[in-house]
Each structure stands twice: as C-alpha cells, then as structure tokens.
C-alpha cells in the first residue's frame, strides 16, 4: 500500500498500451533519471517548472505530467485533462529514516522501542495516505476525468524498456539503498 504516482493526460487520447506513450510530451522534473525513463518508453520528456504545468496542460504545450493524486487535486490539474493514467512507475514509499550512528548509540531496549514505534507510525501513515488517495480519486472522478489502469502487459513493456534506467541508477548509488528501495516496491 503506497501512494501511487502516475501520468496525466490532457487530451482525448487515453493510454491503453505501451505504444500510446510514443511521442507524448510529458512534463517531468529536471531529473536525469526521470528524463531517461520517459525517453526509454518512447515519450518526449519536457522539463518544466511546476508553476507552469497547469498552463502547459491548458495550452497543450505538454500532453501530460507525472504526479501523485495529492498534487493533482491540490493544484487542480485534473481540470485540464480527460484521463488520469495510473502508471505507478514511481512509488511513494512511506518510511522512517534515522541516523545510523544515533540509532546504534542507543541502548538495545531503546532501539527496540524505536523500531516498534517506527513500524506503528509507518503503518498509520500508510493508512492515512491510502484514505487520502481514495478521497482524491473520488474528487477527480466527480469532475468527469476518467482514471485508467494499465494492464499487466503494458506494465511489463514499460519495465522492460526502462531497465537500462534502473541499471544506471544502480551503478550510481549505494547498492544497499537501491536494494532497499526495490524491495519496498516489491512488498
């Protein structure tokens, strides 16, 4: 259970298959991995300041953008498109992070307390996030915007086409961090 991140469409062209991404102008952050991901699946990634996204959708400077439901609703982005396509290409992993030196310096009983408290807090945060997502989806659907879910084959095609991006990330960060992230996605 994680907050999903997806691609938003502003025109009457829904995404049902991998080939539907080809040539689409998708607003991304100015992040080399985001740009590489969208290029790998055939889209035309367009770095753009977030403050320009609403107008970019409105004026068709961009066809789509990637954001979680919270951002879509809080910025009224759903007003400028007919479809929300749940690509789930980026998870929003809710976790508690603590300085390793600080944690190791704690007595064992306090480490156990912190570990248990972190599990409880993380579960609560995920439940709250899930509830907010349900609320945001309802608001989007009430506006007339359709929410589409990609089929397993399209997800597999995306995964295969973007594998080189993940390999690049893996080469540039600590393997333990990469593996923890990927394990979080799987679980």
Where are the regions a protein language model picked out?
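N-terminal secretory/targeting leader peptides
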Residues: 1-5, 9-187
């Amino acid at each position: 259970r994680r907050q999903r991140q997806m691609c938003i469409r502003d025109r009457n062209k829904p995404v049902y298959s991998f080939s539907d991404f080809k040539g689409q102008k998708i607003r991304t952050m100015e992040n080399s991995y985001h740009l590489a991901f969208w290029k790998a699946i055939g889209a035309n990634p367009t770095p753009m300041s977030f403050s320009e996204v609403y107008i970019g959708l409105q004026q068709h400077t961009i066809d789509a953008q990637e954001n979680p439901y919270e951002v879509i609703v809080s910025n009224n982005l759903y007003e400028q498109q007919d479809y929300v396509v749940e690509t789930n290409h980026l998870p929003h992993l809710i976790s508690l992070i603590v300085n390793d030196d600080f944690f190791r310096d704690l007595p064992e009983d306090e480490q156990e307390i912190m570990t248990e408290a972190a599990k409880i807090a993380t579960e609560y945060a995920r439940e709250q996030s899930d509830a907010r997502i349900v609320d945001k989806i309802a608001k989007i659907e009430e506006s007339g915007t359709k929410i589409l879910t990609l089929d397993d084959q399209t997800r597999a095609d995306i995964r295969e086409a973007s594998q080189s991006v993940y390999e690049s990330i893996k080469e540039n960060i600590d393997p333990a961090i990469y593996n923890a992230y990927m394990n979080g996605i799987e679980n």
